[in-house]
């Protein structure tokens, strides 16, 4: 495995958004590459508190990372629309249990659901037969 060019990575994704690794795999790969500080910043998804660790069951992700020599920061990458373009803002050190974050997570879920409905509508309009209920059941 190639050594990381820097010991800090403050913008990573897991399978919870558009990454390829589970939280466990992300930490293990970071540790193997010499990363000392790692932020999990999935798109519009609150960071995981725990992860499934092979042979150990579910563990606190920050504590597991620490045991691997990695300081883990729980973050999020917010998708934002502006009048010019879509932008992404990385949030680190957030109050994950606070009212403001709970409200933002609700807004994100509503926004994503509306976007999926609109995408299906557009695909149907262009002749691709899709049913939202069927998609949600997958």
For the regions a language model picked out, list residue spans one by one.
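An N-terminally biased module of ancient metal coordination in phosphate/nucleic-acid-related enzymes
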Residues: 1-85
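Extended substrate/RNA-proximal surfaces in nucleic-acid metabolism proteins
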Residues: 60-138
